[in-house]
Amino acid sequence: MDTEMSVNMSDFLHDQATRAPESLQQSYILMEDLYERKLWKQLTDALIVFFDTPETVPLRLPLYTNFVNSFRPNINQLKAVYMGLKAFESCSNDEALRNLNQIVNELDEEKYKDAYVYSIVAIARIKLISGKLDEARELLVKASKIIDHIDYVESLIHSSYYSVSADYYKAKADYAQYYRHCLLYLSCIDLDKCSHTELVERAVDLSVAAILGDIYNFGELLLHPVFELLVGTQHEWLHDLVIAMNVGDLPLFERLMGQINKMPLLQSSVALLGQKIRLMALIELVFQLPPNQRTLTFDTIARATRIPSNEVELLIMRALSVGLITGVIDEVTQIVTISSVQSRILNHSQIASMESRLREWNQNIKNLSNVVEISGKGVFV
């Protein structure tokens, strides 16, 4: 029986090789050799290389269906599912969904948790593409619970989960969650293997999410290599807008209003953006002051944030409510005393400013030390 199966598989591989470009024919010879010797790990590795080759797209489905499936129980199940997903790229969404459901039904969830969760995340992606957001969400929640109970999670699984989750939150216009999951996705993948176009699209989406979401610390985005890919493109103004938002740069924000109004998503939220950048301007104002000089008048804040004095208290209360600052407002004297500012990742100019303040503080300590030394001479003699 094994000999007959081997002969049949040999004929199949020879037939497939004749349909393949000359550059790929050697791969089929290698597959046949490894299959006949039952070197499953080496065969799996060779197949992964084959399935990862862009030119093999039309050749993958018959190879997976007729060849890989014949020995699938003998190989790593996560890699088997990976090859299946690569093969289904040439299928319609409905056909891919049927194939994936069959894989899920055949997998032992407890024994092969990694392969199982990878499969249901792939199903969630198709549900999402088909507009079935609730079904996609249910699968993602289920996947998250399984991932939490896997001792070691392959980056392949994490990247897939975060990618689909990010797309889900984008579809739901949940900007803060999209921002978080997209950054997690990017941390799981090799950026060098992504196309420039894909990374620029991610940078655009991340920038919009950072601007519109309930996000007040832009450090992770500013320091991420994809963010700089916006420079030199038609989206460079978004790069500048994020920088303006980060430091509360109102003049730059106002110069970018023409571009903002060209993007409907931002144009419809201009009032929100105005409030957010004024919050950041307030934070920047406080940050620039020494901790012992953070008592501000409403008029000072009004000038820095370019709002009427009678709107300052509302701005401060908003900053307090979202945790950007802690402090006490004196409504009678129209003064606010700031006790702390939310920690943040600093840009180069902010680091330079902090260095200057540290030098000033160090000098003050030296001066105080000299005063104590001179004043105490008579006491310690």
UniProtKB/Swiss-Prot annotation:
Record-level Gene Ontology MF annotations: structural molecule activity
Keyword Transmembrane found: no
Matching InterPro entries: PCI_dom (IPR000717), PSD13_N (IPR054179), PSMD13 (IPR035298), Rpn9_C (IPR040798), WH_DNA-bd_sf (IPR036390)
Segments passing through the bilayer: none
Keyword Hydrolase on entry: no
Positions of the PCI domain: 177-343
GO CC entries: cytosol; nucleus; proteasome regulatory particle, lid subcomplex
Keywords assigned: Proteasome
Alphabetical GO biological process terms: proteasome-mediated ubiquitin-dependent protein catabolic process; ubiquitin-dependent protein catabolic process
PANTHER family listed in its UniProt record: 26S PROTEASOME NON-ATPASE REGULATORY SUBUNIT 13 (PTHR10539:SF0)
Function: Acts as a regulatory subunit of the 26S proteasome which is involved in the ATP-dependent degradation of ubiquitinated proteins.
Family: Belongs to the proteasome subunit S11 family.
Protein name per Swiss-Prot or TrEMBL: Probable 26S proteasome regulatory subunit rpn9
Gene this chain is encoded by: rpn9
